[in-house]
Amino acid sequence: MAIPETQKGVIFYEHGGELQYKDIPVPKPKPNELLINVKYSGVCHTDLHAWQGDWPLDTKLPLVGGHEGAGIVVAMGENVTGWEIGDYAGIKWLNGSCMSCEECELSNEPNCPKADLSGYTHDGSFQQYATADAVQAARIPKNVDLAEVAPILCAGVTVYKALKSAHIKAGDWVAISGACGGLGSLAIQYAKAMGYRVLGIDAGDEKAKLFKELGGEYFIDFTKTKDMVAEVIEATNGVAHAVINVSVSEAAISTSVLYTRSNGTVVLVGLPRDAQCKSDVFNQVVKSISIVGSYVGNRADTREALDFFSRGLVKAPIKILGLSELASVYDKMVKGQIVGRIVVDTSK
């Protein structure tokens, strides 16, 4: 297919500035890169932070955000092997890494000190054509819907890796704090598919309904419960074996240590601005509780997360909007009005 010189994309020139839906140049792939015709992109809370500039990590400017892009390979650099024109490919948060440092050698590529990040340090998937390092680009099976698979590329991989990091077994209880947003709605399904019992913590009747529809076992509305810790203890017959914190509430993170059982694990995923993780040292030591951070996933985690999706074990509850509507999506994110995951169609 003929590749145009210009395309539609959303770009901003300063943090918090206007999100401009406009014609921008189509990027040229470097020798190690793919050029992907992005059909759909999920919208992640990280994209909001990149625009606001409120993380202690510098972005490039101007910037095209987005890091859950699903599309088709239309060109590639001369050093690329193992890919063909027409393959389905995904743009992840980790666009590229050095592949030679200690972290990369240990398959901890997201922790590479030279990591290149889609929609942050590398123009991302809120455009019709985007580049991705051929080594890190996700291989999407041909039998899947590109709109539905888009959120798996970050949200799905992230929660799947977080659940693996909890080191629990089938039949154990996992509590998901922030259960029905874009991350939580996928965490519920991955947890069920991995054989765990799922308790969800969130707010609102709409989210309670979604939690049950996705197969969750017990839902706590934190705005209605009189004693959340006591309710978790009662529901799980002795508190949770693990907690996955995907909320962006500092208070929720600190509270989660209180409803984790002895030798359990608290996994931190959500990144609230300027937050601290506070834990009573005596309680943590005597109960031998582990508090760990989990940051996206490596290539194997991506492959495994996509396999769960392609087998129909997880499905992102998505709403599709046009790329031109991205500013309104950010506004709803700020107000906490997103249920499930928003996916933008780059053709609209």
Swiss-Prot record:
E.C. code = 1.1.1.1
Gene Ontology molecular function, alphabetical: alcohol dehydrogenase (NAD+) activity; zinc ion binding
What top-level branch of life does the organism fall under?
Answer: Eukaryota
The top EC class, named as a word, is: oxidoreductase
Which positions bind NAD(+)? G178, A179, C180, G181, G182, L183, G184, D202, K207, V269, G270, L271, R341
Which residues does the annotation say bind Zn(2+) 1? C44, H67, C154
Primary site of residence: cytoplasm
**One family name in Pfam for this protein:** ADH_N
Per its record, the protein catalyses:
a primary alcohol + NAD(+) = an aldehyde + NADH + H(+); a secondary alcohol + NAD(+) = a ketone + NADH + H(+)
Ordered alphabetically, the record's keywords are:
Cytoplasm, Metal-binding, NAD, Oxidoreductase, Zinc
Query: How is its cofactor bound, per UniProt?
Result: Binds 2 Zn(2+) ions per subunit.
List, alphabetically, the GO terms of the cellular component aspect.
cytoplasm
The UniProt entry, under Gene3D superfamilies, shows: Medium-chain alcohol dehydrogenases, catalytic domain, NAD(P)-binding Rossmann-like Domain
Tagged with keyword Zinc: yes
Q: Where does Zn(2+) 2 bind?
A: C98, C101, C104, C112
Cofactor(s) the record lists: Zn(2+)
Enumerate the subcellular locations listed in this protein's record, separating them with semicolons: Cytoplasm
> Do you know which SUPFAM superfamilies this protein is assigned to?
GroES-like (SSF50129), NAD(P)-binding Rossmann-fold domains (SSF51735)
Q: In the UniProt record, does the keyword Zinc occur?
A: yes
Subunit (UniProt) = Homotetramer.
Family according to the record? Belongs to the zinc-containing alcohol dehydrogenase family.
What is the official name of this protein in its record?
A: Alcohol dehydrogenase 1
Q: Which organism is it from?
A: Kluyveromyces marxianus
Question: Taxonomy-wise, where does this protein's organism fall, top ranks first?
Answer: Eukaryota, Fungi, Dikarya, Ascomycota, Saccharomycotina
The gene is ADH1
